[in-house]
């Protein structure tokens, strides 16, 4: 039987047989997903993006100005928490691979089970305990818990793509819906959180004597009323986002049905985790996809994390950076349907090269200091970011299907593929942020100065222009050797449909 499973070279079939197989495969394929199901699936990914955006923009300033812990302690909380979040990705993938199929699926119980604890940990992350000694341990514990539980939600959610439908086009469409809502969630997280906590960061409680960093004692003094109010608005924002988690997981559970995929000829035979991890990391298309998008994701992360600093210290755009950030995110949201149409029309590899739009416009922003140019660059960056977000999650199911075809005897590796991809993405983002911050340290960045030195300005220009451009070029060069084309993708889809038909037929005969 194992030998039969590998005898699937479609080139040996006659044209009439191939047409017959296509008709039979199309009839055997699962019903297409409704728009409502795709929307419900997409909504399930929104809260993680909202909370991630809120914490990315405001957690550091909250720890320093509201929780009143030292910068060293804040860096400890952020770095260790993110590292722990990355470590939990393969752990969650391993646990999911060992999970049994239940009445509501294999992935849905994970999301339902972790959501209440995720909400509690997120809320307590934005709560200031009464004790001061050891307060850093409070935030380290709950930020680590939040990162781990967020992973326990995100890994099964992204893996769910493989169990929505056996039709690759439907999965791609669901991914486009998901990425649209997730980018919209990022926009909402940055905008809504900013509006709620804006009063916590006004300058009315500070008295700055000059622009050289010499501050009066009044600037260092934090009135009790201000601190109390600031802590309250942050808790209100955390409560709203926590309620959003509960609402979205309810929509996901009620609107999406997880479907098992009978692609394996030996039903229920699961490859052990470490063996499966070794096999996935030796799979050529997966390594190619990871290598290319690690560089591309790191490039996007470097540019995003240094954009506000660049606007403030290197481009004289400090009064416009918030609007520029919103422009980037809005452009990304609006362009995702375009990229979905483009990849269906011209192929995913061709669409991936749309990421290169970021290169000339970023260089233009560095060399031409103009508000109009900055907004043009923001729109172009939004287009590129949308492509970089959509394409890896659209291409990853194709890699998994290709692996299924060449390894039809085992099941349960989908979570390993997805968790490993998320792990390496987080790892690359962490390394990129560490290197960019370290480069600013070498350039003698001084937090007490309103006007930085020329070396800092030059470093920021390199971090916004040259460094991301080089990484994107290398990443796209690697992606050019990605072996899965549109033709091979369709051949794989047909071959898997044949396996599914045989599996269903053998099951009916046994029954």
From Swiss-Prot:
GO cellular component assignments: plasma membrane
Keyword hit for Hydrolase = no
Coiled-coil region(s): none
Instruction: Provide the reaction this enzyme catalyses.
Output: sphing-4-enine 1-phosphate(in) = sphing-4-enine 1-phosphate(out); sphinganine 1-phosphate(in) = sphinganine 1-phosphate(out); sphinga-4E,14Z-dienine-1-phosphate(in) = sphinga-4E,14Z-dienine-1-phosphate(out)
Instruction: Report the superkingdom from the record.
Output: Eukaryota
Q: Name one GO molecular function term.
A: symporter activity
Entry keyword annotation includes Disulfide bond = no
Membrane-crossing residues?
A: 108-128, 136-156, 236-256, 280-300, 323-343, 357-377, 379-399, 415-435, 462-482
Q: How does it sit in the membrane?
A: Multi-pass membrane protein
InterPro entries in UniProt: MFS_2, MFS_trans_sf
Any one GO biological process: lipid transport
Location(s), subcellular: Cell membrane
Tell me the function of this protein: Lipid transporter that specifically mediates export of sphingosine-1-phosphate in red blood cells and platelets. Sphingosine-1-phosphate is a signaling sphingolipid and its export from red blood cells into in the plasma is required for red blood cell morphology. Sphingosine-1-phosphate export from platelets is required for platelet aggregation and thrombus formation. In addition to export, also able to mediate S1P import.
Q: What is this protein called?
A: Sphingosine-1-phosphate transporter MFSD2B
Source organism of this protein record: Xenopus tropicalis
